[in-house]
Design a protein with these regions (language model features):
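N-terminal glycine-/serine-/threonine-rich phosphate-binding loop
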Residues: 46
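Internal, hydrophobic beta-strand segments that form the core of beta-sheet-rich folds
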Residues: 179-180
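Short, exposed beta-strand-loop hairpins at the edges of beta-sheets
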Residues: 183-188
Length: 202
């Protein structure tokens, strides 16, 4: 099922790229570009986090961009706190409460298709993503003996969609604000991160 969906999305990407190249031939100078930015993320485990993302690809026309994306989303995965009790020579005890100690890193890699809904300098756009992602947890316990444990929690196939608005800058670059919903499914893993972010394209 996943294979059929991926093949269907890939065929749509190829068709749009070809059509865009034909309509822009002789009027648009294609170029490679970067898009980098950050985003606020919330997942189905009710964990909030912040992510950074980068996308590199080719602008085929005023309408179609096709590239490869990657990034890291970081969550405070467990809201608990670690405590340390210190007893001095007189028997007095001091309790130290430390910040949340478990962190989660979601690492996606994906093919990225962005389509502008108009040829204006500041258009609305839609985005499709197909790829994969893994989640790694880091547990830090700080007490009498400090320990750090890294664990591969899981991962799977990533499929996502986004919509947003571009804002053209005077130097020819742009800022994009977007809302993104991803679905990551694996044999023993499921996650649906939702993010609100901003990207700088150049």
């Amino acid at each position: 099922m996943n294979r059929k969906i991926i093949l269907a999305v890939a065929s749509i990407i190829v068709s749009l790229s070809a059509a865009s190249a034909q309509t822009s031939e002789g009027t648009f100078q294609r170029y490679n570009r970067w898009m980098v930015g950050g985003e606020f993320v919330r997942n189905i485990f009710h964990a909030n986090g912040f992510g950074v993302t980068g996308i590199y690809g080719r602008q085929f026309s005023e309408i179609v961009f096709l590239g490869a994306g990657f990034g890291v989303d970081t969550f405070i995965y467990n809201g608990g706190k670690s405590t340390t009790t210190i007893t001095d020579a007189d028997g007095n005890q001091t309790v130290i409460i430390r910040p949340p100690y478990r962190y989660s890193f979601l690492v996606p890699v994906y093919a990225d298709l962005q389509v502008n809904f108009s040829r204006s300098r500041s258009p609305f756009f839609g985005e499709l993503k197909v790829g994969g992602a893994v989640q790694v947890d880091l547990e830090r316990i700080r007490g009498t003996h400090n320990t750090n444990e890294l664990e591969l929690l899981g991962g799977g196939v990533l499929m996502g969609a986004a919509a947003g608005k571009r804002f053209a800058l005077n130097n020819g670059d742009e800022l994009s604000i977007f809302l993104d919903i991803d679905c990551i499914l694996g044999p023993w893993y499921a996650n649906v991160p939702v993010s609100l972010g901003i990207r700088y394209g150049f």
